[in-house]
Amino acid sequence: MNADSRISPSIRADYLFMIEQAVRAPSGHNTQPWTLRLFPDHIDILPDFSRALPVVDPDHRELFVSLGCAAENLCIAAAHKGWLGKVSTAIDGIIHVELSRQDGIEAPHFEQIARRQTNRRCYNGSMIPDNTLALLKSIPIEPGIGIHLYQKGTQAFDDIAALVYEGNERQMGDPAFKAELRQWMRYNRKHQDETADGLSYAVFGAPNLPRFMAEFIIAHSLDAARQNRTDRRNIASASHFALFTTHDNRREQWVALGRTLQRFLLASTAAGIAHAYANQPNETPELAERMAQTLGITGEYPTILIRLGYAKASAYALRRPIEGLIVDEG
């Protein structure tokens, strides 16, 4: 490391703050599939393929969406500290966030980064009012990204729900899918605290049981009938589905979708709206294609599906300490 390339203590403190906010981004099974490199004028977000989900996400599409969410959090946190962040995605999938000092930058919904959570609870059935939907639709959308909202009580909503249930039938009938899911389950408080990642028992509202008991219960709960009973109740309690699409099925667009998704989630959080993923149809190419045809959005790639509504806050998933995520400094 050359002396003139070292990061000053004050800048490094700002960068560490940005990273703390970046890694609050959502990720599939809470794998947190990222590492970071710090340089005097930029931060790189790198995909960590050791935390990939080869069964449910074989093309790493959801992984790169998560990296895009992290990049958006980083840019918002940078603005909060008086830095302008400019994002670009390299062909190897590394996200480059160029940082420069700039006064008077808005940091939209910065306070919501810490409040945002994936809420898997049953919602209260209330509908989102039109003026709130208009606010959600007004967020900046990256080029090539589509956002489609479908209200409960419409045929489109019911069609999407049916594809979620069919997705459950396929995934829960796949032993490899269930094995991968169990790999990322964290069965009690001790287990979740040891790893600070994965799907904690707490986010599902489960009790803190001895691990052998929790593993037995989970092993006998992973079946399509049980999952569909849960999802029918949860979907019936929601107000809307939100479907996020890309026009090109490639990494740069997946990252752009993640940035747009994170803006939407933070705006939703600010409005008191809960969200949870219902991405089963998008994780099965045949179902995703059928959904695009059914909804009349052929030419777009359905990528992320969430349900929206109102609910009490849930438990927060843990995040790994950032010290272990920084792999290099310029």
Label each region the model flagged.
Residues 1-330:
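Acidic, surface-exposed loops and disordered segments
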